[in-house]
Amino acid sequence: MRNVKNIDCDLCVIGGGMSGLCAAVTAARLGLKVVLVQDRNVLGGNASSEVRMWIRGAGLHFSEYREGGLIEELALENMYYNPDMNYSVWDGVLYNKVVSESNITPLLGATCVGATCDGNVIKSVSAWGLQSYNSYEIYAKYFADCSGDCILAEFINAKIMSGRESKDMFGEPMAQDECDGMTMGNTCMVQLRKGKQKPAPPLPFTSDLTERVQRRIDIKNNNWDRENFWWLEFGGDDDALHNAEKHNDTAVKAAFSAYSTIEKHAGDDFDM
């Protein structure tokens, strides 16, 4: 029997990445009742332990680019609770930030599957609990699409913009001359640690990436156990959303190929 739960709130936030988390916490502190719908079981999106793309990278080299506000608040709490900078503990820091706000109802492991409108006004969104098998119908005065891929636009036929804008579009002198469809790509999380076993034969589906990796990094002298492989990214020049399965296959093959290449040339053995 289908279990449907109806929820009323002031603001429904779709997506629990850093933008969705900040939107939910800020709104809750302003007194709004918030429902946060996140299709993963951890918060943070690409900054979570699932992908491990650390936030505020520019601030490491240029202090004036360091973000303040809620991001700084999270960074300070992370230093206090997580001095070893462990990503699993970072997940806990983000989770604590949300559950500490009594005005937020988090729905983790729930994915947005539809929306209803009255004219051009969104009245509710539908979500599906991937583990609980609960269906949620969330009614709100306001909705924030922080999914990263404009998932609500798919359900309500809203106009969206994708790609890189031109200089003339918003008066940005540092933008490119012509707009195009280039977006962020897809990746998969890869980490290496020093092992004790002799290098194993490469898997049959891998390729030798010696030339391509060496072009970017000194294979023999890099600290591979501290590398997060942010440069393994695919699909930005394609439809990174609707062709995600294809790009996932490419990313997995590239990850194992890079690992085999490093094992071959680095001088140390690594476990993946």
Task: Please report, for each region that a protein language model flagged, where it lies by residue.
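Loop/turn elements at helix/coil->beta-strand transitions in domains of secreted/extracellular proteins
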Residues: 8-11, 30-33, 101-105, 121, ...
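Conserved N-terminal/central alpha/beta ligand/cofactor-binding core
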Residues: 26, 32-33, 37-116, 161, ...
